[in-house]
Amino acid sequence: MARSDMIEVDGVIVEPRSNGFFTVRLDLENQPEVIAHLGGKLRRHYIRVVPGDRVTVELSPYDLTRGRIVYRYRH
């Protein structure tokens, strides 16, 4: 799937999960929570993500419950 097909949504890290996954609350009207993992560049550059951080998550149009964290906003 092309990167342009992905849906980008902002959210907040709620809690870390096992194996590098995180629960993220999205900034949408009904505030659904998704399970997301760190994208390649965040992992490669050892970017730390802690609960309360604002992030951008990429979601596939085929599965809106799982995603990839592609950006962490600075405080």
Curated annotation (Swiss-Prot):
Q: Origin, by domain of life?
A: Bacteria
InterPro entries, alphabetically? NA-bd_OB-fold (IPR012340), RNA-binding_domain_S1_IF1 (IPR006196), TIF_IF1 (IPR004368)
Question: Which is a Gene Ontology cellular component entry for this protein?
Answer: cytosol
Alphabetized GO MF terms:
ribosome binding; rRNA binding; translation initiation factor activity
Every copy of the S1-like domain together lies at 1-74
Name the keywords, alphabetized.
Answer: Cytoplasm, Initiation factor, Protein biosynthesis, RNA-binding, rRNA-binding
Q: Where in the cell is it found?
A: Cytoplasm
| Main subcellular localisation | cytoplasm
Record carries keyword Thylakoid: no
Q: Which family does it belong to?
A: Belongs to the IF-1 family.
Q: Describe, as the record does, how this protein assembles with itself and its partners.
A: Component of the 30S ribosomal translation pre-initiation complex which assembles on the 30S ribosome in the order IF-2 and IF-3, IF-1 and N-formylmethionyl-tRNA(fMet); mRNA recruitment can occur at any time during PIC assembly.
State what this protein does. Answer: One of the essential components for the initiation of protein synthesis. Stabilizes the binding of IF-2 and IF-3 on the 30S subunit to which N-formylmethionyl-tRNA(fMet) subsequently binds. Helps modulate mRNA selection, yielding the 30S pre-initiation complex (PIC). Upon addition of the 50S ribosomal subunit IF-1, IF-2 and IF-3 are released leaving the mature 70S translation initiation complex.
Which HAMAP family does the UniProt entry name for this protein?
IF_1
Task: State what protein this is by name.
Answer: Translation initiation factor IF-1 1
This chain is encoded by the gene named: infA1
